[in-house]
């Protein structure tokens, strides 16, 4: 008996059980490339968190990204917990795209204050309009939403664990970022913003 073709195994892993699921890969690739290109358009950094201190959120994000990859489930010979079908893939692809577009809305609205790292930019101030009036970290909110949709499309336990790990990493990063910005921008400015606007979930009542 011939061994299973590894390419065929990936094609049946849940991500690519039907051709529309290729749109998920296209969405993420387009988002990643555009995000990397956008990194060249940012304001001058005056202060940043040390790379060593950032390991607390980098590690779960990297681990989660590995778990989310369809090849991980294939290597583990993992079967999907469910299959969403062609229509489901379409819906989840739209939700994934919506989450990615939300991140770009937030990034463009933040303008020159954006950075992939935790930094204070030249002339930095609190931005509390647009998506930043809904949540304090709309980029993370959009990414987590897009990842949840992608994880559901994958339908494997490793994909869902990957989403949870990445979400935890973003939560850790958000907490570190808020401590940094409170110190840099002042408790009166940023602290008041934190008390008024939810961290990641829109419309969540603040204590």
Name each model-derived stretch.
Residues 124-135, 139-140:
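Solvent-exposed interhelical
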Residues 1-122, 128, 146-207:
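Membrane-anchoring alpha-helices and their flanking helix-loop junctions
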